[in-house]
Regions:
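A short, exposed loop/beta-hairpin motif centered on an aromatic-Gly-Thr core
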Residues: 25-38
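Intrinsically disordered, low-complexity segments enriched in small/polar residues
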Residues: 16, 29-31, 67, 82
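Compositionally biased, intrinsically disordered low-complexity regions
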Residues: 20, 33-35, 86
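Short acidic, gly/pro-rich beta-turn/loop elements at beta-sheet edges
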Residues: 21-23, 32, 55
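Short, charged, surface-exposed hinge/linker loops at domain edges
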Residues: 1-8, 37, 41-114
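Short aromatic-glycine-(Arg/Gly/Cys) micro-motifs in beta-strand/loop hairpins
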Residues: 7-26
Length: 114
């Protein structure tokens, strides 16, 4: 079975108790760190783990495994988006059994809250 997954995710960067938090709003997953890059790296690891689990479980509508983040975070994202966004790509390794992965990557829109 061939598998292609490509979608745009929404990442919100904000601070909680002095720690930088990266929040994938579509999957309601978070990563944290001392700075933005560490938080994003931790979040990307969580996103990859969810994708690996989904594909190995043959659940190909990955976003149905997760709940979306609460509306207050989407509001923070929309507010932060007014200050500008960055777009990045998160590649997912093609060596995922039991399917042939034709394409698997995410583009994420990154907005930083004030």
């Amino acid at each position: 079975m061939d598998f292609t997954f490509s979608t745009q995710l929404h990442y919100l960067i904000h601070s909680v108790d002095g720690e930088c938090v990266a929040h994938c709003l579509d999957m309601d997953l978070v990563g944290s760190g001392e700075n933005e890059e560490q938080a994003i790296a931790q979040l990307n690891t969580a996103v990859r783990a969810l994708v690996y689990f989904a594909i190995k479980s043959k659940v190909f509508d990955i976003l149905t495994l997760c709940k979306s983040a609460p509306s207050r975070y989407w509001e923070m994202f929309q507010e932060a988006r007014q200050r500008g966004i960055r777009t990045r790509t998160l590649e997912i390794s093609p060596e995922i059994a039991p399917v042939t992965v034709s394409e698997c990557h995410f583009t994420y829109v990154l907005a930083v809250a004030a």
